[in-house]
């Protein structure tokens, strides 16, 4: 380009006829590395691992719960042993309607 503005004479186009279909190489030329460092687990090992996870889910575990007395708002701590599913049920009860009363408020109301 000569000058501040391009002109049509300065633009050079080379057109080639493209009427024929040209073949495209679709073969992947990648090579896989050694599979020695990969560990292939048999299906029974995977199933055993899933079984262990399910067994652990059903296993009783201790959980510390901190909450407030519904009467005097004192902090309460209690420990429960429950499976994960049962703990989830207890959590739903806390969210819905379950309230705890401390020992002092429990004796005063009787």
UniProtKB/Swiss-Prot annotation:
Taxonomic lineage: Viruses, Monodnaviria, Shotokuvirae, Cossaviricota, Papovaviricetes
Region (E7 terminal domain): 1-47
Zn finger (unnamed) location: 69-105
Keywords tagged on the record: Activator, DNA-binding, Early protein, G1/S host cell cycle checkpoint dysregulation by virus, Host cytoplasm, Host nucleus, Host-virus interaction, Inhibition of host innate immune response by virus, Inhibition of host interferon signaling pathway by virus, Interferon antiviral system evasion, Metal-binding, Modulation of host cell cycle by virus, Oncogene, Transcription, Transcription regulation, Viral immunoevasion, Zinc, Zinc-finger
Domain notes for this protein: The E7 terminal domain is an intrinsically disordered domain, whose flexibility and conformational transitions confer target adaptability to the oncoprotein. It allows adaptation to a variety of protein targets and exposes the PEST degradation sequence that regulates its turnover in the cell.
Membrane spanning residue stretches: none
Function of the molecule: Plays a role in viral genome replication by driving entry of quiescent cells into the cell cycle. Stimulation of progression from G1 to S phase allows the virus to efficiently use the cellular DNA replicating machinery to achieve viral genome replication. E7 protein has both transforming and trans-activating activities. Induces the disassembly of the E2F1 transcription factor from RB1, with subsequent transcriptional activation of E2F1-regulated S-phase genes. Interferes with host histone deacetylation mediated by HDAC1 and HDAC2, leading to transcription activation.
Biological-process GO terms, alphabetical: DNA-templated transcription; symbiont-mediated perturbation of host cell cycle G1/S transition checkpoint; symbiont-mediated suppression of host innate immune response; symbiont-mediated suppression of host type I interferon-mediated signaling pathway
UniProt name for this protein: Protein E7
SUPFAM superfamilies associated with the record: E7 C-terminal domain-like
Quaternary organization: Homodimer. Homooligomer. Interacts with host RB1; this interaction induces dissociation of RB1-E2F1 complex thereby disrupting RB1 activity. Interacts with host EP300; this interaction represses EP300 transcriptional activity. Interacts with protein E2; this interaction inhibits E7 oncogenic activity. Interacts with host TMEM173/STING; this interaction impairs the ability of TMEM173/STING to sense cytosolic DNA and promote the production of type I interferon (IFN-alpha and IFN-beta).
Parts forming coiled coils: none
Signal sequence bounds: none
